[in-house]
Amino acid sequence: MKKVTHIVEELVTPIVTHMGLELVDIEYVKEGKNWFLRVFIDSPTGIDIDQCGVVSEQLSEKLDEIDPIPHNYFLEVSSPGAERPLKKARDFERAVGKNVYVKTYEPIDGQKEFEGLLTAFDGQTVTVEVKVKTKKKTITIPYEKVASARLAVIFS
């Protein structure tokens, strides 16, 4: 049996592609007593509430047709926000030159969390320039060791 997120991805991808948008992420989570199906969309120029509404309506119709979720849930369609997740290689490629927060599966140079400027991504390694006190240090992280990553808003 397919996971709910895979089914939703198959349903929503043609909708967002037709609208010239990008599917960023899908979450299906239980919070308290309620289930939430969250779909995050974006475009190079950003998205607006009307685009979210259209995607929500069209996806809701498709979900009603096949009914893959056996209980009540809330459908939310939105932008991924300023600290959008970096999930795919193309996300990292687009984020070069931006501030990021990266968690790794195992320690690299004695730590598992890094925040700084993403200076390079070659498909195999993620290179982040971090500040250590008053100096800058370059950390090279093997791509397969990245547990999670997102854009980071850094206040100086």
Curated annotation (Swiss-Prot):
The keyword Repeat does not apply. It holds the Pfam family RimP_N. Gene3D superfamilies: Ribosome maturation factor RimP, C-terminal domain, RimP-like superfamily, N-terminal. The keyword Cytoplasm applies. It comes from the Bacteria. One of its GO terms (cellular component) is cytosol. It is found in: Cytoplasm. Keywords: Cytoplasm, Ribosome biogenesis. GO terms for biological process: ribosomal small subunit assembly; translation. InterPro entries: Ribosome_maturation_RimP, RimP_C, RimP_C_sf, RimP_N, RimP_N_sf. Required for maturation of 30S ribosomal subunits. NCBIfam families: PRK00092.1-2 (NF000928). Belongs to the RimP family. HAMAP family: RimP. This is Ribosome maturation factor RimP.
